[in-house]
Amino acid sequence: MKKFIILGYGNPDRGDDGVAYYILNRLVQELCRSETALTEFQESGIYEINQDVDIWYNLQLIPEVSQDLANYENAIFLDAHTAEIPEEMLVTEISPHYQNSPFTHHLTPASCLDLADQLYEHSPFSTLITIRGYQFDFSRELSDQTRKLAEQALTTIMEMINRTN
């Protein structure tokens, strides 16, 4: 069983909603010690960074990721949030729990974990990291505020990975 999967979701074409995509690219650079960036092919599905860490990216969480989650000891979910959450960066432990959604295409991290637990009898220890977004226009650029928060999130993730090694 691998140690970590880091799951990012959000729309990189909508400004700060792409913060997870930015962080995953930075993780590849940090952990691979190169300027390698995710390619279009690698943007869907699981990408192996090293023997302990994989990353996954999509526009939204999908039920199929539950099968993958069952193969890891730890999971970190990355997403953007709006001003409805007061913290600029929220880091919180999440547990398997089905959460009903008014949208048929929307799953929460807790619901994905619950599916993994119910179907595959294992869900990883999981953390949700959400980063405050300030602009969500059509753009592939992060706002300065969100970029700074993304770098803080990257430091937090690296510390979590290093603690388990």
Role assignments for model-derived ranges:
Residues 1-124, 128-131, 140-152, 160-164:
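N-terminal catalytic or cofactor-binding beta/alpha core of small enzyme domains
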Residues 137:
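Glycine-rich phosphate/diphosphate-binding loops and the adjacent beta-loop-alpha structural elements
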Residues 157:
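Hydrophobic "lid"/C-terminal helical patch
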